[in-house]
C-alpha cells in the first residue's frame, strides 16, 4: 500500500524539479550532501566494515536524497554514525528474506505500520524502544509496538469545479451520488481507504467504521461500478483521469490533489471532509547489524520538527511530529493533511485492523473490481 504512495512522491518531486518548482538552494544542498561521504553506498565490507553505520531502506529515486538530507546527514553529524540509503524497496517479502537470511544487511525500513505489526508478531521486527523514541513527539494514537510514525498522507475527494460550479461535495455520500453530482468516478486499485469511503457513503458513522464490514463496502462499490471509469494504481493516473476529463470526481492521494489543484489553476479542487488519513512509519529489522540502540536513536532523531519540515517541503508528506505544523508557512498549511484544521475533518485508517485483515480484504476487493 505504502510503496505505491512513496513511489508517487518521487514522481511528484521529479516533476517539481523539472518545472523549477523545487528550491534550487535545496537541490544544491542535497547534491552537496550526497557528494560528501558517498552516503548512497551499501554497507561497507572488509576493513571498512568496522566503521559504525546504519542502512536505511526506502523506495528509491529522489526519496534517497530527501531522506539523506532530512535525516541521514544530521544524524551522522550528531553521532558519527553514517546512514547509508538503500532504495531497493522494503517490501514485506524483502524484509522477510533479510530476517530469514540470519545475517540481515538492512537496519531500518520505511514501512507500512500494519506490515511492521504483522512481521513484528512473527519476530522479524524489533519493538520500538519508547524510552528512546518520544511518543510525546507523535500525534496521539500513532505510535505502535513495532512501528513509529514518521509521516502521513490522505485519500481525499478531488473534483472538477468547472463541471459543478459553486456546488462542491461535502463528503463520501456526495462521491457516490451521481444524481446530485453527475459524471464518472475513479477509485484506488488497492483497496485501502476505499472500504471506508464506501461505508461512510452508506451511512456508517466515522467512529463506528471499525471493524470494517468489508462485504457491505464491497457490495456498495460493486453496485456503483458502472459509474467508475478507472481504478488507478499510481498517482499520475489518478491526476490524468481528472485533467483529461475522463472522470469528474476521484478519490486520490492528498499529495496529488494539491498538485493537480495547482496545475489546473484551481479548476480541479479537493476537500478534506471525510478524507482518510494513512500513516507511514519506520521500523527496525530484528537482529539488524548496526544494532538496535543506534537504530532507535536514528528514529528519535527523525522526530526533529525541522527535519520533518524538509520531508514536507520535498515530498509533501504530512509530518508526524505536531510541532512541525507551526513551521509550515501559512500559504502551505492547506496542503498539510495533518494540520489541525484539516485533520479534524478526517478519519484515520486503523492500522491494527489492516494488520489482521488487509490481505483477505484485498483479495475480495480485487475480485469485485475485476469482475
Where are these regions (language model features)?
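N-terminal twin-arginine translocation
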Residues: 19-26, 35-50
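Periplasmic-binding protein-like
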Residues: 153, 214-224, 264-286
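Extracytoplasmic ligand-binding site segments that recognize negatively charged/polar headgroups
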Residues: 61-68, 104-241
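A ligand-binding cleft/hinge motif common to bilobed small-molecule-binding domains
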Residues: 116-120, 243, 248-266
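N-terminal secretory signal peptides
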Residues: 1-26
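Early extracytoplasmic/lumenal segment of secretory-pathway proteins
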Residues: 50-113, 117
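Mature extracytoplasmic/periplasmic domains
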Residues: 285-346
Amino acid at each position: 500500500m505504502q510503496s505505491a504512495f512513496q513511489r508517487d512522491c518521487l514522481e511528484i518531486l521529479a516533476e517539481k524539479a523539472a518545472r523549477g518548482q523545487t528550491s534550487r538552494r535545496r537541490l544544491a544542498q542535497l547534491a552537496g550532501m550526497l557528494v560528501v561521504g558517498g552516503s548512497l553506498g551499501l554497507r561497507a565490507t572488509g576493513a571498512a566494515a568496522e566503521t559504525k553505520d546504519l542502512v536505511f531502506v526506502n523506495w528509491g529515486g529522489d526519496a534517497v536524497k530527501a531522506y539523506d538530507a532530512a535525516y541521514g546527514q544530521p544524524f551522522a553529524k550528531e553521532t558519527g554514525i553514517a546512514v547509508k540509503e538503500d532504495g531497493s524497496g522494503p517490501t514485506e517479502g524483502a524484509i522477510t528474506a533479510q530476517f530469514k537470511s540470519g545475517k540481515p544487511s538492512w537496519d531500518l525500513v520505511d514501512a507500512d505500520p500494519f506490515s511492521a505489526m504483522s512481521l513484528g508478531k512473527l519476530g522479524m521486527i524489533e519493538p520500538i524502544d519508547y524510552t528512546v523514541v518520544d511518543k510525546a513527539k507523535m500525534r496521539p494514537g500513532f505510535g505502535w509496538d513495532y512501528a513509529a510514525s514518521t509521516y502521513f498522507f490522505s485519500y481525499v475527494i478531488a473534483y472538477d469545479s468547472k463541471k459543478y460550479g459553486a456546488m462542491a461535495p461535502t463528503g463520501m455520500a456526495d462521491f457516490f451520488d451521481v444524481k446530485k453530482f453527475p459524471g464518472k468516478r475513479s477509485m484506488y486499485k488497492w483497496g485501502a481507504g476505499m472500504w471506508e469511503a464506501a461505508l461512510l457513503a452508506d451511512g456508517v458513522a466515522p467512529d463506528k467504521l471499525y471493524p470494517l464490514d468489508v462485504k457491505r463496502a464491497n457490495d456498495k462499490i460493486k453496485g456503483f461500478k458502472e459509474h467508475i471509469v478507472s481504478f488507478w494504481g499510481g498517482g499520475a493516473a489518478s491526476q490524468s483521469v481528472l485533467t483529461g476529463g475522463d472522470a469528474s470526481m476521484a478519490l486520490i492521494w492528498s499529495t496529488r490533489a494539491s498538485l493537480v489543484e495547482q496545475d489546473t489553476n484551481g479548476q480541479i479542487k479537493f476537500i478534506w471532509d471525510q478524507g482518510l488519513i494513512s500513516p507511514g512509519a519506520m521500523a527496525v529489522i530484528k537482529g539488524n547489524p548496526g544494532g538496535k540502540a543506534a537504530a532507535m536513536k536514528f528514529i528519535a532523531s527523525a522526530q526533529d520538527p525541522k527535519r520533518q519540515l524538509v520531508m514536507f517541503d520535498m515530498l509533501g508528506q504530512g509530518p508526524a511530529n505536531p510541532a512541525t505544523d507551526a513551521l509550515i508557512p501559512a500559504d502551505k498549511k492547506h496542503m498539510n493533511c495533518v494540520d489541525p484544521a484539516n485533520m479534524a475533518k478526517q478519519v484515520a485508517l486503523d492500522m491494527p485492523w489492516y494488520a489482521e485483515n488487509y490481505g483477505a480484504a484485498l483479495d475480495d476487493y480485487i475480485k469485485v473490481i475485476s469482475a
